[in-house]
């Protein structure tokens, strides 16, 4: 559906974001090495409650996501509730939409508020690429199940004798799409070739991302939305993202070799987002509930949309498909936006989506629209840098983008912002945010 869909409660309330917070993001195996995503999620949620000053007992719903799952704690949301002082009666469940996971968490909390089943909720996500669910081979897994049913030592030894040495090796988590076997970088390479995205363009975008993120940190605008994280063994604190290159120089990017297509590729480690650890969350409630609690909203959720396309080609075009829906449901055009924040999984993916925003042919043949969304004004685009610089803890990125965009809109005196992301599985997400002066 693409008609205007007002996001209001039965009482006519808008859906308010009251506060947002994240941990500093850290590259894999650095500051959060050995710290599970659950602990990062509890850390940011606890601090969010403290900073807001809201009684934890008032939280009626927590929806949280995690992409790299922890088998020992499959419902990260419920564990966060139990570990942060909220009421045991606070409902909680976990979601996963790959890189758009916290967008989904926000949508779910918004829907519950609109339905009237809750008035106050928290949405967010956490991921750790440093604490991974290392598995075992299928042969060993089957043998272990059979051994559990074996009654005698002889039966167990017979089962073990059928294993080969290679069956005992650990199995690292897959980094490719289950349905295609393609890595994200393979798709980014394909998109770069299909849409004529050059190596120079990708490196320029990556450099821009780091430069703007460094400026954001140096100016202090991120201080209030990023907590200082103290994690075991509590010897050091992290107060800034450790992936941002404060000394980024464009000429350095050309020195790196392609990471996926080694001979003819243009996607490198420098123009891609790195594996990252971190967590982010937002506090949401109905507009009238915020007023009754004496809380001033950061802004409001004007609309949202999700999309799904094929995974064989162009799998990372989610923003080009989801954004037109979100804008239509908000009743606004691209030119009405004050800010546009797009997840930078890869520079190639980002530039391909921007190119299709302006393509009439794509609009007609793929979206069924008469005309393209339009050319994106780069002065409005990823003005504080993006995921290439900050990093990308999969389930946390959406909440980071929402909080960052709302705060920047407030600094600019209000307006509308579009946040949008691609996701594995050919998925996409987009949300229109509103800040009133």
From Swiss-Prot:
EC number: 2.3.1.16
GO terms of biological process kind: fatty acid beta-oxidation
Residues in coiled coil: none
InterPro entries given in the database record: 3-ketoacyl-CoA_Thiolase (IPR050521), Ac-CoA_C-AcTrfase_FadI (IPR012806), Thiolase (IPR002155), Thiolase-like (IPR016039), Thiolase_acyl_enz_int_AS (IPR020615), Thiolase_AS (IPR020610), Thiolase_C (IPR020617), Thiolase_CS (IPR020613)
Protein name, per record: 3-ketoacyl-CoA thiolase
Catalytic activity: an acyl-CoA + acetyl-CoA = a 3-oxoacyl-CoA + CoA
Any one GO MF annotation of this record: acetyl-CoA C-acyltransferase activity
Matching CDD domains: thiolase
């Amino acid at each position: 559906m693409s008609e205007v869909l007002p996001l209001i409660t039965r009482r006519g309330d808008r859906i308010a974001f009251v506060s947002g917070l994240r941990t500093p993001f850290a590259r894999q195996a650095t500051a959060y090495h050995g710290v599970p995503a659950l602990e990062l999620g509890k850390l940011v949620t606890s601090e969010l409650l403290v900073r807001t000053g809201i009684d934890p007992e008032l939280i009626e719903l927590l929806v949280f996501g995690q992409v790299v799952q922890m088998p020992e704690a499959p419902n990260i949301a419920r564990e966060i509730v139990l570990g942060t002082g909220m009421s045991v009666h606070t409902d909680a469940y976990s979601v996963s939409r790959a890189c758009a996971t916290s967008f989904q968490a926000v949508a779910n909390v918004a829907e519950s508020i609109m339905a009237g089943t809750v008035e106050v909720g928290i949405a967010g996500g956490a991921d750790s690429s440093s604490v991974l669910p290392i598995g075992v081979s299928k042969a060993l897994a089957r043998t272990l199940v059979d051994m559990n049913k074996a009654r005698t030592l002889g039966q167990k030894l017979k089962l073990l004798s059928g294993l080969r040495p290679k069956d005992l090796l650990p199995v690292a988590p897959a980094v490719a799409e289950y349905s295609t076997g393609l890595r994200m970088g393979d798709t980014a390479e394909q998109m770069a070739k299909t849409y004529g995205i050059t190596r120079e363009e990708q490196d320029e975008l990556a450099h821009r991302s780091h430069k703007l993120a460094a400026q954001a940190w140096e100016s202090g605008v991120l201080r209030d939305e990023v907590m200082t994280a103290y994690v075991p063994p509590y010897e050091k604190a992290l107060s800034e993202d450790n992936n941002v290159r404060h000394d980024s120089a464009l000429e350095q990017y050309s020195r790196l070799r392609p990471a996926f297509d080694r001979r003819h590729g243009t996607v490198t480690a420098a123009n891609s987002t790195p594996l990252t650890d971190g967590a982010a969350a937002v506090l949401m409630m109905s507009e009238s509930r915020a007023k009754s609690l004496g809380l001033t909203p950061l802004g409001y959720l004007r609309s949202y949309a999700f999309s799904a396309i094929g995974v064989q080609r162009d799998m990372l075009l989610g923003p080009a498909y989801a954004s037109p829906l979100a804008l239509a449901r908000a009743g606004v055009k691209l030119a009405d936006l004050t800010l546009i924040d797009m997840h930078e999984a890869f520079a190639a993916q980002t530039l391909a989506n921007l190119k299709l925003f302006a393509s009439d042919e794509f609009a007609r043949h793929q979206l069924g629209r008469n005309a393209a969304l339009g050319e994106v004004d780069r002065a409005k685009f990823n003005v504080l840098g993006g995921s290439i610089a900050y990093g990308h803890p999969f389930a946390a990125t959406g909440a980071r983008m929402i909080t960052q965009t709302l705060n920047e809109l407030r600094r600019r005196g209000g307006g509308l912002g579009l946040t949008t992301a691609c996701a594995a599985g050919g998925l996409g997400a987009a949300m229109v945010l509103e800040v009133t002066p």
